[in-house]
Regions:
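Nucleotide/phosphate-binding catalytic cleft detector across ATP-hydrolyzing
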Residues: 1-235, 254, 264, 278-325, ...
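Small/polar loops that bind or transfer phosphate-bearing groups
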Residues: 33, 191, 238, 259, ...
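Short glycine/serine/threonine-rich phosphate/pyrophosphate-binding segments
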Residues: 39, 221-222, 232, 241-247, ...
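Short, charged, surface-exposed secondary-structure boundary motifs
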Residues: 79, 269-270, 389-394
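Glycine-rich beta-strand-to-loop/alpha-helix junction loops that act as flexible
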Residues: 109-114, 240, 354-364
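Glycine-rich phosphate-binding loop of actin/hexokinase-like ATP-binding domains
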Residues: 232-274
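Nucleotide-binding motor/catalytic cores of P-loop/tubulin-like NTPases across gene-expression machines
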Residues: 253-256, 350, 358-408
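Feature representing long, continuous alpha-helical segments
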Residues: 269, 322, 326, 330-337, ...
Length: 446
């Protein structure tokens, strides 16, 4: 399977992606979250029109199927054993199909790895008539894309993040406004070429076609952020099993994104090593007794810890809860210091002072929001999955924000995202009409 990496490969809303027509007509949608600790699938049914408002979309979307299995063949969000990954994907999707009593053929895939990188490029044009028209917006966007060097990395998301007209900035919809010079600032998010190919390979071997892809932290924001947070700007920090991802979202658009290979599994490994116990017992200790803030009674509260490889009455040691907390805090400080470095980078410069929302299974630890607020020097809260119709109470915690957000993305994807190979080939055959379709896309998107 080959992947196109030219800058101007963009999906248009008036062009149906191959293999997705049947599900689109029936209103059946599916999302897949390929994580390092678990692989989850959610099937939804869109009842009613794909309204423009997020609240309307949420009320019209109902979850009808769910499946989850332990991750296999995945390390740090990337495929390391395609046969094992295929098997795990099949198990999760099969469970979701059985619960929904529906067979699916295409799916939206959330991506947590691939070293996402964002850059903003600017294009300037003089308006043709003194009033901004679709061709002017198209020309400004093409100028901006002309400055982009993706270095062979496929574009995952592309957003016009800002417009300026005669040096008046902050314009969301420039069409129809009077002005001489139009500026378009375009945000581009790319991922590693081989990473995306291997994810698509594993999904394809499970007899599914990726209808589109979405960055995991961006999907989490679609689910966990409030309307005001999405509009005013917020940073999502998605703490997964092996990967922590950051996304700055403003005006419902992805402005910046990054990730690094540290997550909840590293905390579990630290506990196992520090307490000389098994991974399974370490995970249990972390889940039941882990906290990010030391309490006054932690040194007096003793925990029974089974020793690794020991049996009998002498196989249990007793340690103070405070010792467990110190193990966790040491690693949490490292994780959030990495986050702070990335938030201080030029890519996230516009996010200064905005709220941080923690998502992912790793964000459920008591006291983590307060701990993160101290390290990041920002207001922090834990975000929970949006309450879609048909979701169980178990699926509404922070560990399912990516999956539910990917389902929302499937219901109304951005008009520009990474494409499967068939759609690339179809676009390549119609390159002569590219500018005309791009103009129509801009009229709808802006």
């Amino acid at each position: 399977m080959g992947f196109c990496v030219v800058v101007n490969v963009i999906a248009f809303p008036d062009r149906q992606i191959a293999g997705d027509k049947q599900t689109a007509k029936s209103g059946i949608l599916a999302a897949l979250d390929i994580g390092s600790s678990k692989i989850s699938c959610m099937i939804g049914e869109l009842r009613g029109p794909r309204a423009r408002g997020q609240s309307d979309l949420r009320s019209n979307l109902r979850v009808v199927g769910f499946g989850q299995t332990a991750s296999r063949g995945i390390k740090s969000g990337a495929v390391v054993d395609v046969a094992e990954a295929e098997c795990a994907i099949r198990l999760a999707v099969d469970a979701a199909e059985r619960s929904a009593q529906i067979s699916i053929h295409s799916i939206t895939v959330a991506l947590s790895g691939g070293r996402p990188a964002t850059a903003t490029h600017t294009g300037h044009v003089m308006t043709q008539t003194g009033i901004v028209g679709p061709r002017d917006v198209e020309a400004a966007l093409m100028r901006a894309l002309g400055h982009a060097d993706t270095q062979g990395r496929p574009i995952l998301h592309l957003h016009p993040v800002n417009h300026a007209l005669d040096n008046v900035t902050g314009i969301g919809r420039p069409l129809g406004l009077h002005g001489a010079e139009l500026q378009a600032d375009v945000g581009i998010t790319t991922v590693d070429h081989a990473y995306l190919r291997n994810i698509a390979l594993a999904v394809g071997r499970a007899h599914l076609e990726p209808s589109n892809f979405v960055l995991a932290s961006y999907a989490a924001g679609k689910s966990a952020l409030t309307a005001d947070e999405r509009a005013l700007g917020s940073v999502v920090i998605e703490i997964g099993g092996s990967v922590t991802s950051l996304a700055f979202i403003r005006h419902d658009k992805l402005v910046a994104a990054e990730s690094f290979n540290m997550g909840g599994q590293l905390l579990t490994n630290d506990v196992a090593h520090g307490l000389s116990t098994s991974i399974a017992h370490a995970e249990r200790m972390k889940t039941l007794f882990g906290t990010a803030i030391e309490g006054g009674h932690d040194e007096r509260e003793m925990l029974a810890v089974p020793l690794l490889g020991e049996k009998g009455t002498d196989s249990v040691q007793h340690v103070a809860k405070g010792f467990l907390t110190r193990i966790l805090v040491a690693r949490l400080e490292e994780i959030f210091e990495h986050c702070a470095k990335r938030l201080a980078s030029p890519a996230f410069a516009q996010s200064a002072g905005t709220r941080v929302v923690l998502t992912g299974g790793g964000s459920l630890m008591p006291g983590l929001a307060e701990f993160a607020a101290r390290v990041l020097n920002r207001t922090v809260r834990v975000g929970f999955s949006t309450a879609l119709n048909g979701m169980s109470e178990h699926q509404r915690h922070a560990g399912f924000t990516v999956l539910s957000g990917a389902l929302l993305h499937a219901a109304r994807p951005d008009p520009h995202y990474a494409l499967p190979e068939k759609a690339w080939n179809a676009l390549a055959e119609a390159r002569m009409g590219y500018a005309r379709r791009l103009g129509r896309w801009l009229a709808e998107a802006l």
